[in-house]
């Protein structure tokens, strides 16, 4: 058997994706960081936001920007998918009730699946990881990921009491949008 020519040749052809589902503020970031500290695992965060942000990281430190630039360079041009439409039509639970958008959904599904497969492969190759952790939470996104033959998918469902999830939205020590208990109907 000939030796592998590069480190990339040693990785499996299919990236292994650990997809974390559950309510926001259920512990997915803590789980992702813990897994990301293990050899061969890269915590990518909530990848459902990658296309709407055109692959631009929200934090602009040099190492992070350089990493995501290398990821984008490994991918094709997902121009049709940039923006919020794929997320609204394919990933969000409310998409199930948007029967008026079935044509748009059908038109977006194939490029969405191709870009998503490319994204996981590009992240795994750039990070030198066998596993990519995506903590996007959405069950419909998990459903779309299950249809991708190019990845090996593992699902994790985090469960936290509804009262604790709602209480966490009222905290002011988190750099995300806050909701009051009245807004969340608690």
Predicted regions and their residues:
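Extreme N-terminal, non-catalytic leader segments
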Residues: 1-17
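Hydrophobic/aromatic beta-strand patches that form the interior of the parallel beta-sheet core
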Residues: 18, 42, 154-157
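A conserved segment at the C-terminal end of the G1
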Residues: 29-41
């Amino acid at each position: 058997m000939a030796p592998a020519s590069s480190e990339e040749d040693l990785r499996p052809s299919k990236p292994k994706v650990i997809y974390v589902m559950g309510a926001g503020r259920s512990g997915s970031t803590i789980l992702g960081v813990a897994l990301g500290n293990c050899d061969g695992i890269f915590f990518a965060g909530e990848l459902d936001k990658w296309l709407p942000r055109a692959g631009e990281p929200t934090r602009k430190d040099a190492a992070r920007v350089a990493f995501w630039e290398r990821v984008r360079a490994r991918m094709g041009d997902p121009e049709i998918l940039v923006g919020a439409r794929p997320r609204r039509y394919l990933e969000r639970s409310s998409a199930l009730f948007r029967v008026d958008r079935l044509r748009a959904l059908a038109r977006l599904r194939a490029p969405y699946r191709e870009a998503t497969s490319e994204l996981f492969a590009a992240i795994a190759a750039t990070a030198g990881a066998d596993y990519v952790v995506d903590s996007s939470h959405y069950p419909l996104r998990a459903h779309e990921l299950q249809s991708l033959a190019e990845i090996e998918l593992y699902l994790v469902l985090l469960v936290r009491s509804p009262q604790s999830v709602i209480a966490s939205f009222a905290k002011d020590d988190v750099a995300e949008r806050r909701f009051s208990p009245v807004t969340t109907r608690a």
